[in-house]
Amino acid sequence: MENISDLWNSALKELEKKVSKPSYETWLKSTTAHNLKKDVLTITAPNEFARDWLESHYSELISETLYDLTGAKLAIRFIIPQSQAEEEIDLPPAKPNAAQDDSNHLPQSMLNPKYTFDTFVIGSGNRFAHAASLAVAEAPAKAYNPLFIYGGVGLGKTHLMHAIGHYVIEHNPNAKVVYLSSEKFTNEFINSIRDNKAVDFRNKYRNVDVLLIDDIQFLAGKEQTQEEFFHTFNALHEESKQIVISSDRPPKEIPTLEDRLRSRFEWGLITDITPPDLETRIAILRKKAKAEGLDIPNEVMLYIANQIDSNIRELEGALIRVVAYSSLINKDINADLAAEALKDIIPNSKPKIISIYDIQKAVGDVYQVKLEDFKAKKRTKSVAFPRQIAMYLSRELTDSSLPKIGEEFGGRDHTTVIHAHEKISKLLKTDTQLQKQVEEINDILK
């Protein structure tokens, strides 16, 4: 085999013949080869749940398949993209190219092939960060330098950094693009001092066109590494080279960060990414399902999106978990199956938190209204009145603001929510039939 990607693709073709189609689509199709070191093949799984399942159910089969292909007994190790980003990849040496010096190039596979601008789902929480990243990719060091992206875990910071790298390389194959974590920068710096190779280290990172450095907050408290990165930053900035930095917090909130570094991080543009709203979460799930060739009912994606609102990584992991559970018990995917599949990761110990989705579903069950009709523009009484009841209950049973409730009902104005609440409140004082129906809905929600 010419390289590990070819080897793994050949292995996948063989594995596809040995397992059921749902199992292959769920567990194996989305894996990629990471590296091959000392007879250990490292495979990247899309998330922690898939990694754990592959380790416990497919390691032996994969090892046997690779033995048939290579005649070598390879150990198998699984990782997830987050840990992949922090490890150095050893690839078979590429063929020499006289027109291009690869000595300062990061191997192409260090940039996750799935993290591009095309695969990034844009929503209200990341729209500005996406626009800034695209501007930087289109004109390195001419738009915002540095670009500082911050936000919580699993919200897409690393995705945008990889997307910048891919875009730059695609439009300028000779560009020297380096992506690494601040932890890897620290470790390499320490090793360079130990091995008396400080000059080589500086040349490596001060002679690039684009430096993408992830999780810069881990430089906090590391005085010598901060000193080195300060000079690296200056060298690149003075040569008009692009610097992109990510963190879990803005520069001013990183503890024990030198003021001179903090001020340099603030030279360019600082943008944040916030957790995705409901519509964005649904769009993310749809894109993930399409990319993986999965046919997922809309009600299931709506259920998952309502239950998992923390970050994209957990959201996609929940989808894979539902698909896997469906495959294992050989049943079609629906909302009830999704609830069963996710019961272990959705805590039940605390008091039940009722969501607007829960209310819409309960009202829909009682009044025979489809979930999508609550967001639609339909004004027929058979839809409009149940919608008003759902708005009333959303105001009574959730902590959501008026604009948020309106947003969940198709982007309606907050005054519409107020009107619905006042109308239903007034009717409930005299309409016994409505009282019974609302009581029935409340029983469903308990």
Swiss-Prot record:
Q: Name one Pfam family in it.
A: DnaA_N
What organism does this protein naturally occur in? Bacillus anthracis
Domain topic, free-text comment: Domain I is involved in oligomerization and binding regulators, domain II is flexibile and of varying length in different bacteria, domain III forms the AAA+ region, while domain IV binds dsDNA.
Q: Origin, by domain of life?
A: Bacteria
* PANTHER family with a match to the protein in the record: CHROMOSOMAL REPLICATION INITIATOR PROTEIN DNAA
Q: Which region ranges are annotated with the description Domain II?
A: 93-109
Cross-referenced NCBIfam families: DnaA, PRK14086.1
Annotated region Domain I, interacts with DnaA modulators: the residues are 1-92
Primary location: cytoplasm
GO MF annotations in UniProt: ATP binding; ATP hydrolysis activity; DNA replication origin binding; lipid binding
Q: Where is this region: Domain III, AAA+ region?
A: 110-326
What processes in GO biological process is this protein linked to? DNA replication initiation; regulation of DNA replication
Quote the cellular component terms of the Gene Ontology held in the record: cytoplasm; plasma membrane
Q: Which family does it belong to?
A: Belongs to the DnaA family.
Protein name according to UniProt:
Chromosomal replication initiator protein DnaA
Q: What is the lineage of its organism?
A: Bacteria, Bacillati, Bacillota, Bacilli, Bacillales
Tell me where it resides.
Cytoplasm
Keywords (alphabetical) are: ATP-binding, Cytoplasm, DNA replication, DNA-binding, Lipid-binding, Nucleotide-binding
Q: What does this protein do?
A: Plays an essential role in the initiation and regulation of chromosomal replication. ATP-DnaA binds to the origin of replication (oriC) to initiate formation of the DNA replication initiation complex once per cell cycle. Binds the DnaA box (a 9 base pair repeat at the origin) and separates the double-stranded (ds)DNA. Forms a right-handed helical filament on oriC DNA; dsDNA binds to the exterior of the filament while single-stranded (ss)DNA is stabiized in the filament's interior.
Q: Which cysteines are joined by disulfide bonds?
A: none
